Regions:
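Conserved N-terminal subdomain of the carbohydrate kinase-like
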Residues: 1-65
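Structural motif
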Residues: 65-66, 111
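N-terminal glycine-rich "phosphate-gripper" loop used for MgATP/nucleotide binding
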Residues: 71-73
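Conserved phosphate-binding/catalytic region of the ribokinase-like
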Residues: 124-210
């Protein structure tokens, strides 16, 4: 936790609302398949188990145009408030495609990301259904098979950049960061997908991606 705190400050991020608690750091236990491919084994919530943002934290968060979170961020109950404040919520569902979660979360989301093992014939139907709950964009990533975005009118696909892979930790997070950056600067869908693929390609070449 302390290392991440220092890293945030190194990148000149505002840490005034970062809560520091005694206890274990929230982590995912992971394994590497074939020496390079990350596999999530278990979420250990640590201090995040009891995390609750203060009212000052919430008001501070609402000053931003974009908010990124996920199912473990413990702010799902705040999504309606964030949307009402005009914030665009970027939501990482990871591998979770539970319909109950989608119905509860997606009405308040601007762009949703889903991690899929393979690009199956059913994926387009899934993205159409996910978008029917309300988000502007829904994106699926397929590892080495690239990515796909649906905006309600068309499906756009993007391949990966072929680079030497050290490990895939951070590949998904960096793809989301690149795609979101594209949204922020006004890229079209193709441009956003390319931004995601380019940043992800940089990250998978590093052993210490963060």
């Amino acid at each position: 936790g302390g290392e991440m705190f220092d890293l945030c400050r190194e990148y000149q991020m505002d840490t005034s609302h970062l809560q520091v608690k005694e206890g274990k750091t929230s982590v995912y236990r992971m394994a590497l398949k074939d020496g390079v491919d990350r596999v999530h084994l278990e979420n250990i919530p640590g201090v995040m188990e009891y995390y609750e943002p203060t009212r000052k934290d919430i008001e501070f968060t609402k000053t931003f145009d974009y908010i990124h979170t996920d199912l473990t961020g413990r702010v799902l109950h705040l999504l309606p408030e964030f949307k009402e404040a005009g914030c665009k919520v970027i939501f990482d569902f990871s591998i979770n495609k539970d319909e109950e979660n989608m119905a509860a979360v997606l009405p308040y989301v601007h762009c949703a990301f889903f991690s899929c093992e393979k690009k199956t014939p059913e994926i387009r139907e899934f993205l159409i259904k996910a978008r029917s709950y309300g988000p502007e964009y829904v994106v699926a990533t397929f590892g080495e098979e690239g990515s796909m975005c649906y905006d309600g009118e068309r499906f756009c696909e993007q391949g990966i950049r072929v680079v030497p892979v050290v490990n895939t930790v951070g590949a998904g997070d960096s793809f989301i960061a690149g795609f979101t950056w594209g949204l922020m600067v006004g890229r079209d869908i193709e441009g956003c997908l390319k931004e995601g693929a380019d940043l992800s390609a940089q990250i998978v070449q590093r052993f210490n991606p963060y």
